Structures are given as C-alpha cells and as structure tokens.
Amino acid sequence: LAPSQAGAVELYDASEALQQAAHSAVLAYVDVNAAAIDHLVGLAGRQRMLSQRMAKFYFYRSWGLYDAPAEIELRFSRAHFTAVLIQIEKSPLVSTQVRAALAQLRREWEPYQQVLFASRDPVKMRMNAARVARLSERVLAATENLVTQLAAPSQRAPS
C-alpha cells in the first residue's frame, strides 16, 4: 500500500497499542526474573523501542500529523533514551563486551539525536527523512547488540 494520512493514523494507533503490550510483557519478565542483570536487559530492550519511537514521531512531525503530541513524545523519548543509556553505562554489573556495545551505541546515538532535532520545519525534516531512517536503523542494530551482550551467558557468570 502507498503511504497515506489515513494509513499513518492507523499505524499510530496500532503502534501505541503494541508499545503498551510490549511494556507490560517486559514488566512481567522482570517481575519473574528478579536478577539485577535482567533489569538491565529490560532497559536495553526498551532502548530498541525508543529508538524506533523517535523515528516514528519525527516522521509524524515531518508530515504535519500529531504535531504537538509528536514533538512532546519525541523529546520525552530522547530524554528517556539518554537517561537509560547513562544508567546502563554506569552499572557495575556490565562486562567488557557490554561496555564495548555501549560505546558503539553511543557512537550511533549522537548523530541520530542531532538529526532528529536539527530542525522543526516540516520541509527540512522531510529532506532529512532518509538520513533519519538510516541512522534509526543503525541505532536499532546497536541496541540489539547491547541486548544480546547483556543476555549472553558470559554476562551472567559470576565474576
């Protein structure tokens, strides 16, 4: 199907419902698996979602849809992503491999957040849309690697 405003509205509603369901699943997982490292796995998993959420709200703003709420959500998601990244970086629980994954995520994150907030003009935002999509995928890959490293059996081995 070709992109349309009606399709974008439908996607918005569906993705918000999916995000709520995913958040509930993560909370249930953390409740069952009370190890401290599992909390970090959940946080890193949320980073994946937040990276995609920021791109989604960027695109909504560039299309003139949900402009004020999208701006608020975009800024909230960036603040949350940044705070969680710092929290994981400061954790004494992470291994050398996780620290390397965090460094890679930080390298991918900086240019992504810069382009997300480079302009509030929808025309300029649309001109940067392909770059946002590319950088979003790079951040997503880096967050996936972080989750993989945190969930690795070697991360769970006693020091």
What does each of the following model-derived ranges do?
Residues 1-159:
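Mature extracytoplasmic or organellar-lumen-exposed domains after removal of signal/transit peptides
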